[in-house]
């Protein structure tokens, strides 16, 4: 009986844990008519963000409970995510919030409404230097539909015009 219990314990302790690095982030860019702003919502797996925290926030942290480190990570993402116009000029974004929701870390930014139509290129470098397989997916939602860019270490920036538009679900 003890042998079986020991064997069972060994098998269970060697099983992969549910928490693992997703190596992907999702950002949604869309106009909100109520606020008359373009809202940017970045979604990171909390587990991934906590693994990256020592590198990007300057210290170990349990982001779930450390508000200062959440904001440090948010500032890192704010700097790593850039929107530019057709001339290459950066469009002005404001970092407005960060929150933990279950197993996700959300970071919120806004852009003045008049700048939204001028978005020509998107660059998203968050976590790309840390993990070669990291992908940053960016969905841009507008009246024509959804355009998706998949940004990777070898191509962290793309022209929005290169992304085909898919209609919004009815």
Question: Model-derived features: where do they sit?
Answer:
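Bacterial N-terminal signal peptides that target proteins for export
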Residues: 1-7
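Hydrophobic h-region of N-terminal signal peptides that target proteins for export
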Residues: 10-18
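Intrinsically disordered, low-complexity segments enriched in polar/charged small residues
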Residues: 8-9, 35
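N-terminal soluble domains immediately following signal/targeting peptides that reside
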Residues: 19-170
């Amino acid at each position: 009986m003890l042998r079986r219990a020991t064997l069972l314990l060994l098998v269970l302790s060697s099983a992969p844990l549910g928490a693992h690095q997703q190596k992907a982030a999702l950002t949604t860019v869309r106009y909100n008519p109520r606020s008359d702003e373009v809202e940017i919502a970045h979604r990171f797996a909390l587990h991934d963000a906590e693994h990256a925290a020592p590198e990007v926030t300057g210290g170990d942290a349990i982001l779930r409970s450390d508000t200062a480190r959440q904001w440090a990570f948010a500032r890192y993402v704010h700097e790593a995510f850039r929107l530019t116009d057709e001339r290459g000029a950066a469009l002005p974004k404001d970092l407005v919030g960060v929150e933990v929701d279950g197993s996700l870390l959300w970071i919120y930014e806004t852009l003045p409404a008049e700048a939204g139509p001028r978005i020509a290129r998107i660059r998203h470098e968050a976590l790309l230097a840390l993990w070669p397989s990291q992908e940053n997916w960016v969905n841009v939602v507008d009246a024509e539909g959804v355009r998706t860019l998949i940004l990777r270490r070898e191509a962290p920036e793309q022209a929005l015009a290169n992304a085909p538009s898919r209609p919004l679900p009815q």
